[in-house]
């Protein structure tokens, strides 16, 4: 009710969090990433965006091949993994999760257009977690997304999975990069980086690749 009232930011603050027990028994904390940041497919502003404070215990690759053709909307994670993650949220949470429209980049030899996806949960973009398109010697193309204020430093981006250090994917292809085969990710120390031909990788330099998602309510 508060989320839908338009007054959520008078009751809560960025960083406030709630604990959710998934249907699988996995326990995750979700923190307020920002207020009035995201929009529905119809362009209506959504009151609250939440971000996972831990990465999910089951990680993996972002795509079935080393390719960024089609971008995040066409990647294996979004098509084959994300639906089961959303369905594992408790019903009372699924009932208040609001579909958001998210921008990303489809990067191939044909260009790097902005493409959209409409989902109840999603991978964050590099720009949403660092607020820039150039970082630590790597870069991505501007998809129009903006920083969530919960991400203010490398430390704020560090996530654990199964109680151990991990790296986690963003939905942003590395670019310019003429192999068209890599996504940006958050390293175990919280730095946003990329690597060569990584889209089908399940580990990065010995560290497991995992999923840390955002979603909207209200």
Feature annotation, model-predicted:
Residues 1-218:
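Collagenous Gly-X-Y triple-helix signature in extracellular proteins
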């Amino acid at each position: 009710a508060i989320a839908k009232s338009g007054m959520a930011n008078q009751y809560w603050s960025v960083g406030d969090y709630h604990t959710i027990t998934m249907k699988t028994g996995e326990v995750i904390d979700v923190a307020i990433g920002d207020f009035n940041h995201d929009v529905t497919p119809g362009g209506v502003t959504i009151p609250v965006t939440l971000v996972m404070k831990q990465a999910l215990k089951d990680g993996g690759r972002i795509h079935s091949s080393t390719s960024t053709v089609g971008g995040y909307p066409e990647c294996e994670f979004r098509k084959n993994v994300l639906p089961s993650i959303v369905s594992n949220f408790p019903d009372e949470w699924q009932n208040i999760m609001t579909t958001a429209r998210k921008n990303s980049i489809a990067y191939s030899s044909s260009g790097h257009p902005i493409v959209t996806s409409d989902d109840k949960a999603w991978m964050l973009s590099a720009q949403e977690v660092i607020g820039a398109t150039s970082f630590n010697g790597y870069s991505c193309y501007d998809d129009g997304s903006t920083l969530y204020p919960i991400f203010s430093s490398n430390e704020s981006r560090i996530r654990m999975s199964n109680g151990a250090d991990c790296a986690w994917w963003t939905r942003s292809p590395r670019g310019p990069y003429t192999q068209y085969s890599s996504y940006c990710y958050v390293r175990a120390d919280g730095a946003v980086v990329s690597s060569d031909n990584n889209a089908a990788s399940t580990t990065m330099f010995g560290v497991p690749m995992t999923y840390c998602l955002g979603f909207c309510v209200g």
